[in-house]
């Protein structure tokens, strides 16, 4: 009876699905018209209940009659199926180290990477659903982050699965070493028998290396045929992997191919904030926005720019303003890329530096004496030294025309009354403007 039920199920699913989802599946017991199935993995149990309920229901009814029912139980030990080896066994989980910072939570999603992100997340949640998953994109766009996020997610949520993350260079070196030492069988055992999820980074490194491609081809086939999840990253799409064996390229394309596009400006700003958060650092918003707007080659350089500013801040004890950031990051920014700084934006930055009041406070509704004085100095200098229009000043300072006029008048009256402290601050602001103008 047990074999009839299993055979009936097998006829209702394709070979690939049988090997992937039913390899650890067995009939545990039959009591009257109720069948109890068992599986050795909790994820597979939930997947079968969700996706194969109808198949299982029809199969038991064909064998036991229309009143037949079933349930699926999860058992940690191996079922007694004679069909194939179980998909999952209890073993050490993480076979190679992963960067704990590379998680889905730390990955900022935007229009250019949304598809790849969700594909990777689905693979992490449901290993085998998209197999293989091939992620490609330019340098520093987040391929390694996504690849290791899959590994970190599985380690946290699927304790039965064995995860291996490797670069293709490591795969090559391991192969060469095993051949030199006469341990090729051990190499194949390691990569083909002791892995449930294989994550391969920078596969383009194997271009032109025919011997290792052949080994990878057979490794791929054995893992895939056993229902093991494979995820591959490359800097180019499969069909552009020149000097790769056609049969290997076709394997890369048989699952899901996802591209990572360069992030747009808004996504880069969000990524910059996330990087700052991970580094436990603080930078003014205008500085962070400047970095995101101008360092757009790749995310590694974006992170490098942020770290450089944080190191400067920590080692000098100085706050990093926009002008300082421009000077510090000249090697990160393409020539002629930096836009000329708006005169009033630069003025506000200078006023903040001279008075010790932050840019945010100057532009806020804070009416304490220090913030109010700094705000009025800024509007006064903008009107009388920069010759800016009332409309422009009002827009930049988030104030109405009457407020701007009143602020300018109050500063002028105070200067006429001989307020030396106010005059000193204004002179320092104007002096800094002149100095910056001369330095270009």
From Swiss-Prot:
Location within or outside the cell: Cytoplasm
Location (main, coarse): cytoplasm
Residues where ATP binds: 140, 142-144
Domain II: annotated segments: 69-96
Quaternary state and interactors: Oligomerizes as a right-handed, spiral filament on DNA at oriC.
Family: Belongs to the DnaA family.
Function: Plays an essential role in the initiation and regulation of chromosomal replication. ATP-DnaA binds to the origin of replication (oriC) to initiate formation of the DNA replication initiation complex once per cell cycle. Binds the DnaA box (a 9 base pair repeat at the origin) and separates the double-stranded (ds)DNA. Forms a right-handed helical filament on oriC DNA; dsDNA binds to the exterior of the filament while single-stranded (ss)DNA is stabiized in the filament's interior.
Name of protein: Chromosomal replication initiator protein DnaA
């Amino acid at each position: 009876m047990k074999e009839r039920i299993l055979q009936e199920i097998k006829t209702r699913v394709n070979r690939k699905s049988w090997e992937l989802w039913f390899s650890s599946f067995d009939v545990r017991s039959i009591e009257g018209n109720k069948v109890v199935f068992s599986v050795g993995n909790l994820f597979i149990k939930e997947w079968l209940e969700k996706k194969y309920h109808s198949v299982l229901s029809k199969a038991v009814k064909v064998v036991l009659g229309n009143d037949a029912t079933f349930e699926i139980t999860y058992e940690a030990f191996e079922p007694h199926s004679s069909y194939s080896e179980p998909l999952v066994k209890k073993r050490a989980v993480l076979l190679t180290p992963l960067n704990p910072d590379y998680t889905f939570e730390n990955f900022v999603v935007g229009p250019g990477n949304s598809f790849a992100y969700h594909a990777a997340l689905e693979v992490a949640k449901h290993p085998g659903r998209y197999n293989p998953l091939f992620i490609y994109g330019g340098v520093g766009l987040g391929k390694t982050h996504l690849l290791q996020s899959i590994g970190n997610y599985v380690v946290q949520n699927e304790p039965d699965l064995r995860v291996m993350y490797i670069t293709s260079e490591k795969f090559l070196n391991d192969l060469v070493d095993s051949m030199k030492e006469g341990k090729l069988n051990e190499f194949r055992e390691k990569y083909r028998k002791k892995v449930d999820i294989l994550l391969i980074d920078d596969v383009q490194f194997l271009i032109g290396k025919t011997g290792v491609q052949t080994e990878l081809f057979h490794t791929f086939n054995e893992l895939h045929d056993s229902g093991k999840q494979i995820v591959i990253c490359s800097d180019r799409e499969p069909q552009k992997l020149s000097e790769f064996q056609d049969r290997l390229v076709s394997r890369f394309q048989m699952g899901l191919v996802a591209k990572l596009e360069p992030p747009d400006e808004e996504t880069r700003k969000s990524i910059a904030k996330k990087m700052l958060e991970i580094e436990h650092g603080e930078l003014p918003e205008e500085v962070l926005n400047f970095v995101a707007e101008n360092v757009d080659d790749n995310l590694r350089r974006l992170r490098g720019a942020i770290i450089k500013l944080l190191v400067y801040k920590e080692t000098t004890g100085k706050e990093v303003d926009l002008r300082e950031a421009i000077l510090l990051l000249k090697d990160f920014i393409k020539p002629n890329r930096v836009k000329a700084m708006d005169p009033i934006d630069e003025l506000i930055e200078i006023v903040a530096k001279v008075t010790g009041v932050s840019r945010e406070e100057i532009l806020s509704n804070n009416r304490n004496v220090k913030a109010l004085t700094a705000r009025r100095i800024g509007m006064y200098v903008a009107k009388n030294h920069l010759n800016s229009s009332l409309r422009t000043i009002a827009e930049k300072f988030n104030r109405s025309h009457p407020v701007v006029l009143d602020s300018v008048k109050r500063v002028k009256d105070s200067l006429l009354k001989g307020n030396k402290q106010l005059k000193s601050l204004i002179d320092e602001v104007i002096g800094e403007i002149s100095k910056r103008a001369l330095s270009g």
